[in-house]
Amino acid sequence: MGLYASANHNLIHDHFLKEIGCRSTVRIENHHNFAWEQDGAYIHRKGATPSGVGEIGIIPGSMGTNSYVVAGKGNIHSIQSSSHGAGRVSSRTQAKKNLDRTAFKQLVEANDIVTAGVAADETNQAYKDIERVIQLQVDDGVLTPIFKMIPKIVIMGNANKRGNELDRVVS
């Protein structure tokens, strides 16, 4: 992540923590479209994150599904890389066409998830099953899950638009 993006994320996190009266005990930056110099060569990870021995990373799920903090195992067969997320099951255009709005609303309500700025192509229906994605990487010796995060608030870039039918804002 570039310095500008990193600083911006830190500001967002600092403001959020202040508003909810909490403090951070650790910060994890997770690059997923970046080139690293390693052993005299460059490794470009597009949609993948470093997963060296003990390297801490985040593998996000989607709106309504778990995300994971993981530790890498340095698997050379995966070029010491793990997935950055569940991965899409379809293109953004197709995801918008296939979205079952009723099912999405039922999911966020049943799990008491507050959403703002939801994009139709970013719902859980657009992604693979995160539990299976994590398990496959565990089975292949790529990573070890440290803990899972269960979504309660999802805020996306369109959060300031009014009237988004997919938003579930609780006042």
Q: PLM features: residue spans?
A:
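Domain-length cofactor-binding catalytic modules of enzymes
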Residues: 1-171
